[in-house]
Every structure is written in C-alpha cells, then in structure tokens.
Amino acid sequence: MSRKYNTLILGASYGSLLAIKLLLAGHSTKLVCLPEEADLINNEGQRVRMPARGREGLIEIDSRKLPGTLTAATPDAVNPADFDLIVLAMQEPQYRSPGVRELLDAVAKSRVPCMSIMNMPPLPYLRRIPGLDCD
C-alpha cells in the first residue's frame, strides 16, 4: 500500500465494522463517540465479532492486533480538516446532540470528502412512500 489514509468516523457502534476493515488495510481511524466509550476504546481497543464463511460461530477481530491505528474522541476534540475522509455512522437523532451538531457544521466547512452509512433510509425519503406513517 503506497498511501495510508486518515479517516474520521462519527459513531462507534455502526462505525466499528468499517473502522476494523480500514485498520486491516493499514489506515488510521478515529471514532467519534461518548467520553466513556472513547476512554474504553483508547484503553482497550475495539473488538468486532462476526461470522466468517467456512468457520463455525463468530470470529473476533481485535483492533490492537491490526496494522492500522485506532483512536477515539469526543465531538469537541476533533478537527475534520485533519482527515482524508469523514464517515457518518450515527442514527439520525444523535446528530442533534450538543457537540455533534457543531461537529457536523465543521465537517461541512472542512470540504473533506464525506460518506454516510445508514441503517435505514432518511425520513424525507420514507415520507414519499404511500401509506407509511413517518410521524
């Protein structure tokens, strides 16, 4: 690999799997999360358990044993301009939380490439589906 990328992921739950995959490729990743979660991740790393084809049960991948580096921080402790890619991996209500809302403003102003991994379509999309109560 010729270049290592520095990725910021907002959300340590949904963002964990992507973070692990980036670490496997040797990239650096910072997860944005609550203070208690950030302390735990910074002290003990992140573990993801998932099925693997051809294996019984789940495999566990420990971030501390991968070639990339993983850190975690609270929303007020990151500067989006320091990253090559920003990933939105939180559920919609979390983006209204104090600190996260301000971080999103900074993300927009940074003009850093941004992608979203969502667990469901956004409400404006869902409201267009006839017969679906979104209120």
Show the residue positions of the predicted features.
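NAD(P)+-binding Rossmann beta1-loop-alpha1 motif at the extreme N-terminus of oxidoreductases
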Residues: 1-54
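Generic alpha-helix signal with a bias toward terminal, lower-confidence helices
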Residues: 26, 43-44, 53, 60, ...
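Short, surface-exposed, polar/charged, turn-prone segments marking secondary-structure boundaries
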Residues: 25, 36-38, 57-61, 101-103, ...
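N-terminal start-of-chain detector that recognizes signal peptides
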Residues: 1-3, 58-59, 86-88
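Rossmann-like NAD(P)(H) cofactor-binding subdomain of soluble oxidoreductases
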Residues: 68, 75-135
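A sequence-composition feature that detects small, non-aromatic residues
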Residues: 12, 19, 25, 38, ...
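Conserved N-terminal Rossmann-fold NAD(P) cofactor-binding segment
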Residues: 34-83
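Generic serine detector
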Residues: 2, 13-16, 28, 63, ...
